Amino acid sequence: MKFFLDTANVDEIREANALGVISGVTTNPSLIAKEGRDFIEVVKEITQIVDGPISAEVISDDSEGMIREARELAKIHKNIVIKIPMTAEGLKAVNVLSKEGIKTNVTLIFTANQALLAARAGATYVSPFVGRLDDINTDGLQIIEDIVTIFNNYDIDTEIITASVRHPIHVLQAAKLGAHIATVPYKVLMQMVKHPLTDAGIERFKEDWRKAGLKI
C-alpha cells in the first residue's frame, strides 16, 4: 500500500515527506481554504516538496467548467491529478480528460457502483470515503472490499484511494483488503508512527545504557 498525505498544509507535508513514506498528496477546497492562501500558490509549493501525484480539485459543477479548470490546473506541473466529484457531469469531464492524457481522481465515492462507473469513464484513481460512511452507521470498509473485488474481477487498472481516513485502524483494514493507497491526515500518520511500548522500550534502553556508563 502507498500513502498519500491528505492536507494542504505545507509544513505538515514537509515533515511527512522527510519520513520517506509519502508517495503523493491529496487536497480539496476545504483544506485549501483552511490554509487561507492562494490556491494555485499552495499547489505549486506542494509540487516542489513531493515528487508524486498531487490531487487538486475543480470547483465547477458542469462538465465544461470542470474540463476548463482541469486543463489549467494540469499546466502547473506534470504530477497534478485532477479531483473530480462523482456526478454525471463529473463522469463526462473524466471521459474527456482521460482521452487527453490528464490524470483524474474521482472523489466523494460512497458506493462500489460509483467507483465502477468512474473507472469505466477513465479515472486514474477513485476515492471512496470510509469515514463519512461510518458516520451514518454504515460499514465504510465494506465499500473498499467490494471495489477491490470488482476491480480484480475485471482487471481494472484504476487505483483505489481509501479516503476520509479517521484513524490507523482504517488504514490497517484497507491495506488488508487490498486498497492501493490510503490518503491520511497528518495526525493519523503520526498515530501510525507511535506506540507507547516503543516509547517505553526506548526509555528502558537509555536507562540501562546510562547505568552501564557506556558511550558510542
Swiss-Prot record:
Keyword annotations: Cytoplasm, Pentose shunt, Schiff base, Transferase
Residues forming coiled coils: none
Subcellular location(s) of the protein: Cytoplasm
Pfam families: TAL_FSA
Record-annotated active site: K83 (schiff-base intermediate with substrate)
Keyword Cell inner membrane applies: no
Keyword Cell wall biogenesis/degradation: no
GO cellular component term of the entry, any: cytoplasm
Molecular function in Gene Ontology: aldehyde-lyase activity; transaldolase activity
Catalysed reaction equations from the record: D-sedoheptulose 7-phosphate + D-glyceraldehyde 3-phosphate = D-erythrose 4-phosphate + beta-D-fructose 6-phosphate
Pathway the protein acts in: Carbohydrate degradation; pentose phosphate pathway; D-glyceraldehyde 3-phosphate and beta-D-fructose 6-phosphate from D-ribose 5-phosphate and D-xylulose 5-phosphate (non-oxidative stage): step 2/3
Primary localization class, coarse: cytoplasm
Domain of life according to the entry: Bacteria
Signal peptide span: none
GO BP annotations listed: carbohydrate metabolic process; pentose-phosphate shunt
Enzyme Commission number, as recorded: 2.2.1.2
Role according to the record: Transaldolase is important for the balance of metabolites in the pentose-phosphate pathway.
Family to which this protein belongs: Belongs to the transaldolase family. Type 3B subfamily.
PANTHER family to which the protein is assigned, alphabetical: TRANSALDOLASE
Protein name (database record): Probable transaldolase
Organism encoding this protein: Thermoanaerobacter sp. (strain X514)
Gene designation: tal
